[in-house]
Amino acid sequence: MINLIKKGDYVKVDYILEVDGKVIDTSIEEVAKENKIYYPEREYEPIGFIVGNGELIEGFEEAVIGMEVGEEKTVTIPPEKGYGLRDERLIQEIPKEMFADADFEPQEGMLILASGIPAKIIKVTDDTVTLDFNHELAGKELKFTIKVRDVQPAESE
């Protein structure tokens, strides 16, 4: 009997993520090396999650529903079902003097934690630093190639 993935199932999948035609993340070591995004300290293995629990972005979880073990497909996920649209309210200009006690000099492109929240410095002037608190993939269309490796059906009630 073929088990098609449904909400509540525990699945393991391999994936390749492309943004703007460039591979930026994968669970497959060989693909990471080919695309020069390999990190030796990372474990490259299928990711496991319960479908519908909100552990991953909505579009990814929806994409695996109806798939079966061994199946591979490529899906394009719009920002609304990915990391959301960019929100201009999440861009904030703060006085540069707030960095006076920091152990670094703020520079454009730098990623920092501001009150525990990740932000990217997008502009530095003599008096101000502009921070962008949007997720780096906000507003981006995500192209995922997904291959199902394992499915554990949800426990029937």
From Swiss-Prot:
Q: Does the keyword Cytoplasm apply?
A: yes
Gene3D superfamilies the record matches:
2.40.10.330, 3.10.50.40
A Pfam family in this protein?
A: FKBP_C
Q: Which InterPro entries match?
A: PPIase_dom_sf, PPIase_FKBP_dom, SlpA/SlyD-like_ins_sf
What SUPFAM superfamilies does the annotation carry? FKBP-like (SSF54534)
* Region span, IF: 86-137
Q: Where in the cell is it found?
A: Cytoplasm
**Source organism, top-level taxon:** Archaea
What keywords appear on the UniProt entry? Answer: Chaperone, Cytoplasm, Isomerase, Rotamase
Q: Which GO terms describe its biological process?
A: protein refolding
Presence of the UniProt keyword Chaperone in the record: yes
This entry's Gene Ontology molecular function terms read: peptidyl-prolyl cis-trans isomerase activity
Q: What is its EC number?
A: 5.2.1.8
Could you name the Gene Ontology cellular component terms for this entry? cytosol
Q: Which reaction does it catalyse?
A: [protein]-peptidylproline (omega=180) = [protein]-peptidylproline (omega=0)
- Using the record's annotation, list all stretches that form the PPIase FKBP-type domain: 1-95
- Domain description: Contains an N-terminal PPIase domain and an IF (Insert in the Flap) domain.
Q: Which family does it belong to?
A: Belongs to the FKBP-type PPIase family.
Purpose: Catalyzes the cis-trans isomerization of peptidyl prolyl bonds and accelerates protein folding. Also exhibits chaperone-like activity.
Q: What is this protein called?
A: Short-type peptidyl-prolyl cis-trans isomerase
- The organism of origin for this protein: Methanocaldococcus jannaschii (strain ATCC 43067 / DSM 2661 / JAL-1 / JCM 10045 / NBRC 100440)
